[in-house]
Amino acid sequence: TWQTSDPFPERGTGEATLAERTDGTIYYNTRCHWDQNPQPTRRRAAVSEDDGATWKDFKVVDVLPDGLQHRAYGCMGGLVRLPIQGRDIFCFSNIDTAGEQRERVTVWVSFDGGETWPVKRLVESGPSAYSSLNAGRPKTPSEGQIYLHYEAGSGSKLARFNLAWLLGGERTGDGKVPAWATQL
């Protein structure tokens, strides 16, 4: 059987992404599509400590854009936890543009389960929109790979890269890249 959770702590959100941390808590990251919310062009996050029944520690994630920045409507983004033992490395994808077109699909990296996002890397500067992420499985040929599927103009594309490539991106000023991350 299954049960629904309590609602997310803010109205006007949707198309959420979830990732379980190594301690069993669940990180919730969501789109905002209501211009009555504060900072409607930024992503929202919360955490569950009870298997997703309730959500706490709600916050606006200042460093993560939510779609086009000239209007409040958001854009579905992707989220994945990399399967690295004992580490809460998350990747998040969305568009990162000040323009009026959906473009510049970008991936951000967190090394502390979504608390900070210290690095981002542009994947493609052209048209892009909704995106999803997945990670290769340990002990398979896909181990260490990160997969980004995204809308690109009238079709879709798949990009494949690894954490080392992402670390070559731009520092956001939101937290630090830990020394151990460069040795993975």
Give the residues covered by each predicted segment.
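Asp-box/BNR beta-propeller blade signature and adjacent active/binding-site loops
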Residues: 1-184
